[in-house]
Amino acid sequence: MGTIAIIAAVILGISFMTFVAFFGRLPALRNTPISFLHRLIWIHLPNGILTVDRTLTNGRLTTSLTRLGRHLWYDQHPTILIFFFLLLSVGEYLYLPVAWPHFSFTHKFFGTIAILCPYIFLYLSAYTDPGVINAKTHVREMARYPYDFTLFHPGTSCETCHLLKPARSKHCSICKKCVGRMDHHCIFINNCVGANNQRWFILLLLSTAILTLYGGVLGLVIIRAKIQARFPYWTLMPWWTSTQAWNSGDLDFHRWLLLWSWGLQSGVAMGGVTLLALLTTPLVWGLLGYHLWLVYCGTTTNESMKWQDWQAEMDEGGVYKRRMAADGSREKDLKVEPAWTRWPVEAEQIMVRTEDGKPPRSSHRLPGEGEWEAVWRLKDVENLYDIGFWDNLVDVFLPYFMFKESKGRSPVDEREFGRERGRNRRRSS
């Protein structure tokens, strides 16, 4: 009982803290215990330690810790990537010598594939350019998506990169670069997840989820066979035990746990890795499911937060939309917009928020036509970047797929964009 309790407690603790760290900031979990724990661990607890240190050491300890923490959290470094690599390799080193002789040829074949795939996709996720935007790639990234006039508006410049920001892009404060179709910065791959490597990231999640589930189940089967070879009446789940064995006292719940512990102690290394795999499997599958859901919705982690911010604005009132030109004849400002993009649709609406809660005045010269309509729910807003699950998948796995033919000319006027870049640099200097 002691062995199984310690191993399970440690693994559950690590898994739960990882879940809180990764999911605590999600808009869907706002005002929940998970969000509260995230704020407690990452905001209130550090502030409390800072207050105590200021009282006892005049802040010397927290100054050093803050410098270290700033480097760990806000600078690009491979610490967590190395940890993830070691977690995979050390776990397999402890697991395989005991488990491998028990595998059939089929399990050895598919097991080898399951072991290798996470390493391949980890390398591709970490070392593939996520879609960094610079002077050489700016034209290409501008032609990737049109502005939707809801989350992304033309004419916004990055104050760090001195470039007009393409639609769906974001500047990463860790990588210090703008990234096309930015999803998030992932510390496990020491890289941003963007337009060019999101496919490898999803395949990394899928292969890791399969590996943990496959390895955990096979380890469970081996442990069960070992216990049942000596105690035939033992079953994997206590409620599967025969009524006769349960009623006779040969296998009550306490004895069932003792036999579990005995099975783990006969191969502690493999048993510990099996428990780690089984207990982390829901976390990995949940993360995979979340990212597939984002693909289904035609959005990203970054954009989902923007949508939730819009919902908060709608709850307060003062959000309005109106349609763009129905025939797509809107005249574009080619100084800040691409003439064409590879995307199959153009913006159908513009959405804005007003400070006074009243519709925008005509003097504001905002694009669109017709009357302004108050918006209270996200489902009343069209997501330009959701073109159906299949096409969304194509966009992720074939990031340069042309959904429509090019116009035979550059999507942007290089001279106009060059002037705009020059103005941006002068403003920031």
From Swiss-Prot:
Segments on the Lumenal side according to the record's topology features: 1-3, 101-112, 223-274
Q: How does it sit in the membrane?
A: Multi-pass membrane protein
Locate the DHHC domain: which residues? 156-206
Q: Which residues lie on this side of the membrane: Cytoplasmic?
A: 25-79, 134-201, 296-429
Per the database entry, which stretches of residues form a coiled coil? none
Chief location of this protein? endoplasmic reticulum
Q: Cellular location of this protein?
A: Endoplasmic reticulum membrane
Query: Per the record, what are the reactions this protein catalyses?
Result: L-cysteinyl-[protein] + hexadecanoyl-CoA = S-hexadecanoyl-L-cysteinyl-[protein] + CoA
Question: Region entry Disordered: which residue ranges?
Answer: 408-429
Gene Ontology terms, MF aspect: protein-cysteine S-palmitoyltransferase activity
Enzyme class, UniProt record, top EC level: transferase
Segments passing through the bilayer: 4-24, 80-100, 113-133, 202-222, 275-295
Key word Kinase present: no
Its domain description in UniProt is: The DHHC domain is required for palmitoyltransferase activity.
Q: Which PANTHER family match?
A: PALMITOYLTRANSFERASE SWF1 (PTHR22883:SF288), ZINC FINGER DHHC DOMAIN CONTAINING PROTEIN (PTHR22883)
By sequence similarity, the record places it as follows: Belongs to the DHHC palmitoyltransferase family. SWF1 subfamily.
Q: What name has this protein been given in UniProt?
A: Palmitoyltransferase SWF1
User: What is the gene name?
Assistant: swf-1
